[in-house]
């Protein structure tokens, strides 16, 4: 019987059935259907009915998928840190590149929490946080001078994932890609622009 699993690695190399040569990649957090498995390799069923092979250690059984509680969020954030350095790609959600909302969506999808695709849509969902952000909360940024309570709409242009406290991880545009920054002016990774343009914090569980 086929079993479902979730991609655990930052990228998963798909190999063909013959020489198991690399033929494609699967991104972090995607669900797959495992039809055969040993300690080293797992066979996945494709929509076309053929089989491809991936390393078993790069898959997490669906039953072990973390929950969006404090422990699961900390675990998933640890995995997300492995994505630091991946390029920014508008519309992307794979090891070829992520955009800001693609990263936040992949983060929550890994814990089986569905959230909208775009940053402004994500800011309309979840629970508005009035106090300090907790790890896993989403930070929304946009035009300066707009109050946090009004940030559920078109002013949102960027989203990041709180690491707890002032630090956050996000997919930054340009040549930066996925990186860690801070809202703390005393931090070596302080981002003044984003600190000045923080509009809202929202929580998803």
For each predicted feature, which ranges?
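Aromatic- and glycine-rich peptidoglycan recognition patches
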Residues: 66, 93, 153-157, 162-205
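Catalytic cysteine-centered active-site loop
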Residues: 88-135
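Loop/turn positions that initiate beta-strands
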Residues: 26-32, 136
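Boundary regions of SH3-family modules and the immediately adjacent low-complexity/disordered segments
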Residues: 1-8, 17, 31, 38, ...
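SH3/SH3-like (including bacterial SH3b) beta-barrel domains
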Residues: 12-28
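Short, structured beta-strand/loop micro-motifs enriched in basic residues and often containing a Trp
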Residues: 2-17, 116-124, 145
């Amino acid at each position: 019987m086929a079993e479902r699993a979730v991609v655990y690695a930052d990228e998963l190399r798909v190999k063909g059935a013959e020489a198991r040569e690399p033929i494609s990649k699967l991104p972090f957090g995607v669900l797959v259907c495992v039809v055969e498995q040993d300690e080293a390799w797992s066979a996945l069923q494709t929509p076309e009915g053929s089989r491809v092979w991936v390393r078993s250690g790069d898959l997490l059984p669906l039953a072990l998928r973390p929950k969006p509680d404090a422990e699961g969020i900390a675990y998933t954030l640890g995995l997300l840190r492995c994505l630091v350095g991946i390029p920014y790609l508008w519309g992307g959600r794979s090891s070829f590149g992520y955009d800001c909302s693609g990263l936040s969506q992949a983060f929550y999808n890994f814990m089986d929490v569905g959230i909208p695709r775009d940053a402004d849509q994500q800011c309309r969902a979840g629970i508005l946080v009035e106090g300090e952000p907790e790890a896993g909360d989403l930070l929304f940024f946009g035009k300066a001078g707009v109050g946090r309570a009004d940030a559920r709409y078109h002013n949102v242009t960027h989203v990041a994932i709180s690491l707890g406290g002032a630090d956050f991880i996000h997919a930054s545009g340009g040549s930066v890609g996925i990186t860690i920054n801070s809202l703390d002016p005393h931090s070596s990774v302080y981002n003044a622009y984003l600190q000045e343009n923080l509009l809202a914090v929202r929580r998803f569980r």
